Structure formats: C-alpha cells, structure tokens
C-alpha cells in the first residue's frame, strides 16, 4: 500500500496504490501499478503477506522513499567550477575548489532535499556541517556514458535567517585522458529544493552567483594510467577553518565559472555509498633514502592518512 502522507497510510488509504492481495510466487521486483509519481515526491508505504493457509500478517512498519529527478528538464542548475583555463601545463597543480552560496529563509522549512551531481568527488556542507558520512562520493561511473547524482534530506541542517550551502570538490576520476572528460574539472551541479510549512517551494541552484576559492588540497600526478595515481598536496597556508560557515565574508572569493559538459545520461546512484569503517595505526615509520618517509600501516587498505605535525616556530 502506497500513500501520499503518513496520515493516509495509517488509515489504510492507499491513495497512490493499494495492490490488495496478489497471488504470486514473486517476492521481489513487483511492478508498480499505481498513480504516476512526480520528481521529488515522497511516498509512504507498508506491506503485508499471506501464508499458505491464508493467514494474514500484520502490516509492516511504515517506511518512506522519495522519487528522484525523473527528467533532464528537472535539473534547473548549471555545472560550475573554478575559474581556470581549459588547458594547463602538464603536471601543474590545480587546487580543488571550495564553492558556497548564502541565502535567507523566513522560517524553518518542512522539508529540504539537496540533489548533487558531481563530475569528480564532492562533500556537501550546510551551515558548517557535513550532511552525511559518505566519502569518495559519488560512485565511479563511465563519464562518456553516464554520471551519477545523490539526494540528501537536509531540512534539519537549515534554520530561519541566513544559511550557507557549500561544496568541496575533488578530482576523483574526472581527469583528462579518461573517456568523456573534456574539462580540467572537477565540476558540480546541485539544487536545493526547500518546502515551507505553507506549501511554498523555492530552489537554490548552482550558477555564476556562487562563490569559489581554492582549497588547501591540490593533486599530485595526473591519475590517468595505471601506476600514475599520484596523491595530494596540502597547503596549510590556504586553510580557512570557517570556509563553510554562514558567518564568513566571502566577498573576496571569485564568481564560479559555468561549464557545459557533453550531454550524457544523469542517473541516481543506486549503490551504497563509500563510508569510513575503521581507523588503523601505523606500524612503522622510517626515513626514505631519497627523501621523505615510509609509513607502514601493517596491512593493505583503501583510505588516507591523518598526521599530527609539530608546530613550526615563527
């Protein structure tokens, strides 16, 4: 049973779809046969089953899902990124960008959904707080065929008055030399759909009114072939602890540049996100003969390092 509201579902009113009892040996991939659902629509549902002897189970605990953006025309935002030339000298570092946009809300929203479609990786922040536990998001795709977006429920991160939505982009696999990559990236388009208690809906979309600044991170290596993955360079002199806070004065930041990547399919990410699941400690640290240090973590892993460095006397 599917309903447009929790209240209707609690009254056993399946105003979207009430399948009734269906005699079938199928328990998954049941075809939906109800009313047409719209982009961004929230659906409330529950299910029950019958046994061989005709006994009926109680209803399941009510659950919800939200429809994604079903048509290309549902995207009202533009791809944006750093102001930079289309070409650069081989190996020149291109710092990963910070992007942000401030806006005001008259009251606490009833619902807010952020849709983020990044070419490369992204982290989404609202009012200084990261909105999820995802890392290396979105999942990898073939940029010549499709790119992926992720939807985030973010009403709890918003507040009446001044707010800021911010994105930290990373290169990921969006690198020249890979199929479908024509910019030096990374790029992102995003839109925040805000629904007020009175039913009014507004959108915050990525465009050239967003502000951009270089973050402390830039890539090492080109990342275009096996064995050329490189790494990252961190420039602490560029660090700005409150870069994603609504109190920051971003008047010195540059306007974001708008880009037009080749049109390919944009699809919702239909796999679980990457998450950090474990913290491990180094087993051995020793100097490397050619300079630098060798850090032995004791086992193979996918992740990154956290290093505490001594303060440099001024």
Language model feature labels by segment:
Residues 60-64:
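Terminal edge beta-strands and adjacent linker/stalk segments
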Residues 1-16, 48, 129-131, 298-302, ...:
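Non-cytosolic beta-sandwich-type ligand-binding/adhesion modules
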Residues 29-35, 150-156, 296:
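Exposed aromatic-hydrophobic patches
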Residues 70-107, 117, 260-313:
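Solvent-exposed, flexible loop/coil segments flanking beta-strands in beta-rich domains
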Residues 25, 40, 160-161, 288-290, ...:
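Solvent-exposed, conformationally flexible loop/turn segments
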Residues 41-46, 51-53, 66-71, 94, ...:
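Accessory beta-strand-rich segments of carbohydrate-active enzymes
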Residues 201-298:
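Activation corresponds to long, low-complexity, non-globular regions
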């Amino acid at each position: 049973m599917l309903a447009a509201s929790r209240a209707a579902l609690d009254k056993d009113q399946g105003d979207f779809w009430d399948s009734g009892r269906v005699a079938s040996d199928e328990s998954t991939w049941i075809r939906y046969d109800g009313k047409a659902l719209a982009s961004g629509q929230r659906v409330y549902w529950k299910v029950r089953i019958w046994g061989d002897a005709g006994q009926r189970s109680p209803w399941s605990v009510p659950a919800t899902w939200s429809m994604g953006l079903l048509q290309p025309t549902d995207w009202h935002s533009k791809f944006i990124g750093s102001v930079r030339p289309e070409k650069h000298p081989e190996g020149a570092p291109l710092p990963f960008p910070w992007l942000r946009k401030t806006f005001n809300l008259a009251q606490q929203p009833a619902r807010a959904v952020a849709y983020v479609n990044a070419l490369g990786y992204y982290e989404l922040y609202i009012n200084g707080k990261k909105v999820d536990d995802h890392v290396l998001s979105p999942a990898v795709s073939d940029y010549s065929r499709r790119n992926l977006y992720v939807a985030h429920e973010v009403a709890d991160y918003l507040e009446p008055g001044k707010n800021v939505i911010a994105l930290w982009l990373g290169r990921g696999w969006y690198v020249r030399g890979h199929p479908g990559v024509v910019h030096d990236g990374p790029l992102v388009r995003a839109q925040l759909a805000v629904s007020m208690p009175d039913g009014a809906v507004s959108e915050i979309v990525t465009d050239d009114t967003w502000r951009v600044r270089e973050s402390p991170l830039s890539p090492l290596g080109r990342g275009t072939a096996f064995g050329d993955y490189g790494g990252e360079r961190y420039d602490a002199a560029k660090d700005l602890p409150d870069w994603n806070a609504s109190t920051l004065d971003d008047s010195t930041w540059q306007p974001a540049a708008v880009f037009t990547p080749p049109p390919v399919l944009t699809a919702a990410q239909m796999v679980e996100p990457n998450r950090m699941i474990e913290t491990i400690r180094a087993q051995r640290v020793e100097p490397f003969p050619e300079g630098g240090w060798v850090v032995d973590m004791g086992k193979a892993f996918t992740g990154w390092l956290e290093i505490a460095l001594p303060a440099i006397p001024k």
